[in-house]
Amino acid sequence: METNKQTILIVDDDPDMQQLLQQVLQVAGYEVLCADNANDGLRLALSRAPVLAILDIQMPEVTGLTLAKSLVEETAVPFVFFTSTGRQDEVMQATRLGAIGYLTKPINPDQIIPFVSVSMVRARDLQQMKAKAETARAIGAAIGLLMAKHPINESQAFQRLHDHARAKRAKIIDVARAMVSAQENINLM
């Protein structure tokens, strides 16, 4: 079994669409997981952590939009929509939920791989931006803690943080996170 294949989750109640997507993606070298309802789709997303989820919006019981909200709240799985409607309100709701892309059915099979490839690059870029923002927040918070404790400016606080990380042979982000976590624990007491 090949372990370096990227996994894509398809959640669509239409078996023909599911089969089309699965065939095209497998030929392109992806491992494909399929679910015909949102609840099974969420279970697969939680247990298998696919690199991308392809969701239909209109499904019985739980919609793809509701599933997307659950993916945002419970996983880090990026998602796109392939749906039979192109209603503006659904497009706006999908965008607000964080959809990476949106295509309306019927889908030309030749569009699937380029759409998925671009969506995955976009998802990776967004994840990197989030990681950088989190790093900046943690370092900024640690600098703020140092400035509150010592009569120093921002540049001096950063230098102290940098020197401390170097002395510990640790990454500056790890030292910053430890400082912030320690302060949060002190605040809970």
Predicted regions and their residues:
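C-terminal output/effector regions of signal-responsive regulators
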Residues: 130-189
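Active-site beta3 strand of CheY-like receiver
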Residues: 48-54
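Conserved acidic segment of CheY-like receiver
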Residues: 2-16, 21-25, 53
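C-terminal output helix
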Residues: 89, 107-116
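The feature encodes the CheY-like receiver
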Residues: 18, 60, 83, 87
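Short amphipathic alpha-helix used as the core "switch/output" element in two-component signaling
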Residues: 43, 65-75
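Acidic catalytic/metal-coordinating carboxylates
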Residues: 36-40, 61-66
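Short hydrophobic/Thr-rich beta-strand motif most characteristic of the beta2 strand and flanking loop
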Residues: 29-36, 44
